[in-house]
């Protein structure tokens, strides 16, 4: 089905952007992505960061190559996560699909607190910078800095931020931006309760429930992970639930302070399902990582641990200084991805160099259905396309196609932390997995990009043309 065919679906020709979908089922049936947009950042910041455009069309002669590279006008940004100006939430009853399309990438610099707006419509392989929001605008109007996650919601763009104004430690929170002008409107939080740390943001859109998670303040991360703070259990370990209408804090769910860094939020895509998954980077008790499900329990929110991934023993001499005293490699679950049909959860183990697939049809009883190994602190496993080339880094930012058949991932976590866990260099690479009809994952031997193709930058988040499994939310089942 072409984009034009899809626009004619149900007779509503061109009444909204054809990449907006009313339901997860519709999204999965849409045309596959032909391009991926990838955040590429310079470390050290001796040149501008960029958005790399990668050809993902297997029938294309330039498949699995960088076909566009838009450098930004400043240095020192550290591109990290980014999102679209508009998406399927525009089709919600509270949305307005008449005045927008999936055209602009909203790209924050997590170091600089600048936010770039890039137009992908005129030439999709060469996005053009159309506006730059300076850090002073975010600080003055919202009281925040160090922007992280961007989500397109009905009414506003929601952008989580780690720091207070001007890079101060906090509290962090969520800034609201205008969909059309990209002006910063202000803080989301009317009453933040006991929330101080920030990281990710997402929601149960039909229920008017917003969820946020916790990483750290800027001073706790920008010069690297601080071992004393980690062992002192000072990094984030709580989830926060909010009323989207009143913008008031409703409830805090503490996972336990041994579970340090509760990061990525992946709510079910089916709006009738009021649960979601969150990944925890590390337990200070045994270096394990874990996956939790948040859910309702007698009218309150609760969280249940459903997956534990143990650390892997390793000789001290093979470990970076940060880990030598522990004699083990922590999995370091730093990203997760949930397929649009809510069936498979993908878990990045950046430390051990493994990407796991779980069947989460029953979210309280996940079953591992697939695994691949690549990179890793100790293993340094190669990609099948280059079997003689050991790789640093490991599966990190993971993105799942809308139809659930393809999984893309990159290998850098965060500039200052890359050096601590991979002190001899993390490199830069991106690869893709194919998903079996009944589960299971395997490398696409044709899809492996590394090194010079990214022009001396490291790579982090991937966004797929037309939306992906972590870009859109839906109001209809």
Regions found by a protein language model. Name each.
Residues 9-16, 28-100, 106-134, 169, 191-363, ...:
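Beta-propeller domains
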Residues 9-32, 78-101, 143-153, 202-208, ...:
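Structural signature of eukaryotic scaffold interfaces centered on beta-propeller domains
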Residues 25, 30-31, 38-45, 92-103, ...:
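Short, conserved, GDST-rich strand-edge loop motifs in beta-rich repeat architectures
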Residues 53-62, 117-128, 179-182, 241-247, ...:
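Short loop/turn segments immediately following beta-strands, especially the blade-tip
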Residues 65-84, 130-143, 187-196, 249-263, ...:
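Surface-exposed loop and turn segments in beta-propeller and other repeat-based domains
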Residues 119-205:
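Asp-box/WD-like beta-propeller blade repeats and closely related beta-sheet repeat scaffolds
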């Amino acid at each position: 089905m072409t984009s034009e065919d899809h626009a004619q679906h149900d007779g509503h020709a061109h009444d909204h952007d054809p990449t907006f979908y009313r339901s997860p089922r519709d999204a999965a049936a849409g045309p596959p992505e032909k391009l991926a947009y990838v955040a590429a950042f310079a470390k050290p910041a001796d040149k501008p960061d960029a958005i790399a455009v990668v050809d993902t069309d297997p029938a294309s002669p330039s498949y699995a190559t960088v076909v566009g590279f838009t450098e930004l006008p400043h240095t020192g940004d550290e591109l990290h996560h980014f999102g679209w100006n508009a998406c399927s939430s525009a089709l919600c009853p509270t949305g307005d699909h008449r005045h927008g399309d999936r055209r602009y990438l909203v790209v924050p610099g997590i170091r600089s607190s600048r936010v770039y707006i890039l137009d992908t419509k005129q030439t999709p392989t060469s996005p053009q910078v159309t506006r730059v929001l300076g850090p002073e605008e975010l600080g003055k109007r919202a009281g925040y800095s160090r922007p992280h996650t961007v989500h397109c919601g009905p009414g506003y763009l929601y952008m989580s931020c780690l720091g207070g104004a001007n890079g101060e430690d906090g509290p962090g929170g969520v800034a609201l931006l205008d969909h059309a002008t990209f002006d910063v409107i202000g803080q989301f939080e009317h009453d933040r309760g006991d929330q101080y740390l920030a990281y990710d943001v997402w929601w149960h859109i039909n229920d008017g429930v917003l969820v946020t998670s916790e990483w750290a303040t800027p001073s706790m991360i920008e010069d690297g992970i601080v071992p004393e703070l980690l062992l002192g259990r000072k990094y984030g370990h709580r989830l926060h639930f909010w009323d989207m209408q009143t913008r008031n804090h409703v409830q805090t769910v503490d996972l336990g302070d041994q579970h340090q860094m509760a990061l990525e939020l992946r709510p079910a895509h089916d709006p009738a399902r009021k649960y979601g998954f969150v990944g925890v980077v590390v337990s200070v008790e045994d270096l394990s990582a874990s996956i939790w499900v948040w859910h309702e329990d007698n009218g309150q929110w609760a969280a249940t641990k459903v997956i534990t991934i143990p650390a892997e023993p390793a000789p001290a001499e093979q470990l970076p200084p940060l880990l030598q005293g522990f004699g083990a490699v922590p999995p370091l679950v730093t990203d997760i991805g949930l397929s649009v049909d809510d069936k498979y959860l993908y878990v990045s183990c950046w430390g051990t160099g493994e990407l796991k697939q779980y069947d989460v049809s029953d979210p309280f009883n996940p079953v591992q259905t697939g695994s691949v190994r690549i990179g890793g602190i100790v293993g340094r496993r190669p990609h099948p396309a280059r079997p003689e080339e050991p790789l640093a880094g490991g599966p990190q930012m993971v993105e799942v196609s809308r139809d659930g058949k393809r999984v893309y991932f990159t290998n850098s976590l965060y500039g200052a932390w890359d050096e601590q866990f991979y002190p001899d260099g993390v490199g830069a690479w991106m690869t893709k997995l194919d998903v079996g009809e009944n589960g299971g994952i395997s490398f696409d031997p044709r899809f492996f990009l590394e090194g010079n193709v990214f022009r001396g930058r490291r790579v982090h988040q991937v966004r797929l043309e037309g939306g992906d499994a972590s870009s859109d939310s839906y109001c209809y089942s």
